[in-house]
From Swiss-Prot:
Pathway it works in: Cell wall biogenesis; peptidoglycan biosynthesis
Membrane topology note: Peripheral membrane protein
Catalytic reactions of this protein: di-trans,octa-cis-undecaprenyl diphospho-N-acetyl-alpha-D-muramoyl-L-alanyl-D-glutamyl-meso-2,6-diaminopimeloyl-D-alanyl-D-alanine + UDP-N-acetyl-alpha-D-glucosamine = di-trans,octa-cis-undecaprenyl diphospho-[N-acetyl-alpha-D-glucosaminyl-(1->4)]-N-acetyl-alpha-D-muramoyl-L-alanyl-D-glutamyl-meso-2,6-diaminopimeloyl-D-alanyl-D-alanine + UDP + H(+)
Function: Cell wall formation. Catalyzes the transfer of a GlcNAc subunit on undecaprenyl-pyrophosphoryl-MurNAc-pentapeptide (lipid intermediate I) to form undecaprenyl-pyrophosphoryl-MurNAc-(pentapeptide)GlcNAc (lipid intermediate II).
Keyword set includes Cell inner membrane: yes
EC number(s) reported in the record: 2.4.1.227
Species in which this protein is naturally found: Trichlorobacter lovleyi (strain ATCC BAA-1151 / DSM 17278 / SZ) (Geobacter lovleyi)
Annotated protein name in UniProt: UDP-N-acetylglucosamine--N-acetylmuramyl-(pentapeptide) pyrophosphoryl-undecaprenol N-acetylglucosamine transferase
Ligand binding (UDP-N-acetyl-alpha-D-glucosamine): T10, G11, G12, N124, R165, S207, I263, Q308
Enzyme class: transferase
Subcellular localization(s) per the UniProt record: Cell inner membrane
A GO BP entry: regulation of cell shape
Protein family (similarity comment): Belongs to the glycosyltransferase 28 family. MurG subfamily.
GO cellular component, one term: plasma membrane
Length: 381
């Protein structure tokens, strides 16, 4: 059988598609997968490196654009639709999965025109425009968070969770004995080794870091009590741009921290953490719930439709995280939140347990099972 995975643009859209592709290929050595994306999306770089086939089509957004940009975007979508039909004729897929992002729209619509079974997956609590449109022509809508169900046709929406790649799942779910800690001794301001501490704090803002977190965290830790500062062990992924600034900030306050531009072994960093402070992207949420870790989310305020905040709020109402908006992390807001959680290990444990209850480690398997079963298209409205 053949599967097309269409969409991307960001890792949050693309990586679940890769997880589904892995599961689909594992079912039969003869199965084939083709990714379809746009030249400007992360897929243009990531998919070839992973060894998958990739076709690029014309696609662009039109929301929030001026009149000329909207016309150009519409023209690109029409051209992308024509390109998609050619790809479908050439590749002859049995199934098409849209994972969100601009490139998913023309491909899934073309699949509908050619009566090829088509499915979509929504990662966030607040769906993007493409998936809202495509839900009207999809055979099935797979969602990661139940909060997004109200945006889709009830009779063909299934809560599956957010698929994680097998490599990531294996890393996340290994026990400490299977994969002993590899994080080296702490660095004081990134330079001097020191002994282990009693409370592990892990901060990251994605592969590029998050400037607001990078500025706020050293200041927040500096406001903790001397006792709390002696207990805390900090692992802080900054991204390249802020590395030296963050190292200097910890040093200036006499604070111990392991400051790195990037962390390759995220699974170990996750597992060792008592508290994680990070953004609220869909993939991050899937990973931390898979591990049952307590998180303090600081949603990226400029995400489309503020969807990261909606993601965090979905967990917050279930007692599965703490959340501060970016405006609250300056001053004493962040330090008070850290101090409160440091002093209440039972609260941390409960947050982690509630997060673990939301984890769906079989998301990729369920999605592939559903696609292979085949269902009738949703009723168009």
């Amino acid at each position: 059988m053949k599967l097309i995975v269409a969409g991307g643009g960001t890792g949050g859209h693309l990586f679940p598609g890769i997880a589904v592709a892995e599961e689909f290929l594992s079912r039969d050595p003869a199965n084939q997968v083709l990714f379809v994306g746009s030249e400007r999306g992360i897929e243009a770089r990531a998919i070839p490196r992973l060894g998958y086939q990739l076709e690029l089509i014309s696609a662009a957004g039109i929301r929030g654009k001026g009149s000329l940009a909207k016309l150009k975007g519409a023209a690109m979508m029409i051209y992308g639709y024509a390109q998609s039909r050619k790809i479908l004729h050439r590749f002859q897929p049995d199934l098409v999965l849209g994972v969100g992002g601009y490139a998913s729209l023309p491909m899934v619509m073309a699949a509908r025109g050619m009566e090829i079974p088509r499915y979509i997956h929504e990662q966030n609590a607040l769906p993007g425009m493409s998936n809202k449109v495509l839900s009207r022509v999809a055979n099935k809508v797979f969602i990661s968070l139940e909060e997004s169900a109200k945006f889709f046709p009830k009779d063909c929406t299934l809560l599956t969770g957010n698929p994680l790649r097998k490599q990531i799942l294996e890393m996340l779910t290994q026990t400490e004995t299977e994969n002993p800690p590899s994080i080296p001794p702490l660095l004081k301001g990134g330079s001097e080794p020191c002994e282990q501490r009693g409370f592990n704090l892990f901060i990251f803002g994605g592969s590029q870091g998050a400037h607001a977190l990078n500025v706020a965290l050293p200041q927040a830790v500096a406001q903790l009590s001397p006792k709390q500062q002696r207990l805390i062990k900090i692992i802080h992924q900054t991204g390249e741009a802020d590395l030296q600034q963050v190292q200097a900030a910890y040093q200036a306050n006499g604070l111990e921290a392991d400051v790195r531009p990037f962390i390759d072994d995220m699974a170990t960093a996750y597992r060792q953490a008592d508290l994680i402070i990070c953004r609220a992207g869909a993939t991050t949420i899937a990973e931390v719930t898979a591990l049952g870790k307590a998180c303090l989310f600081v949603p990226f305020p400029h995400a489309t439709d503020d969807h990261q905040r909606k993601n965090a709020e979905a967990l917050l109402k279930k007692g599965a995280c703490e959340m501060l908006v970016e405006q609250e992390i300056g001053g004493k807001g962040l330090s008070e939140a850290i101090a409160r959680l440091m002093e209440n290990r039972d609260a941390l444990k409960l947050i982690g347990e509630n997060a673990a209850a939301l984890a769906r480690l079989d998301a990729a398997r369920v999605i592939v099972d559903q696609m292979l079963e085949g269902v009738q298209p949703c009723t168009e409205t």
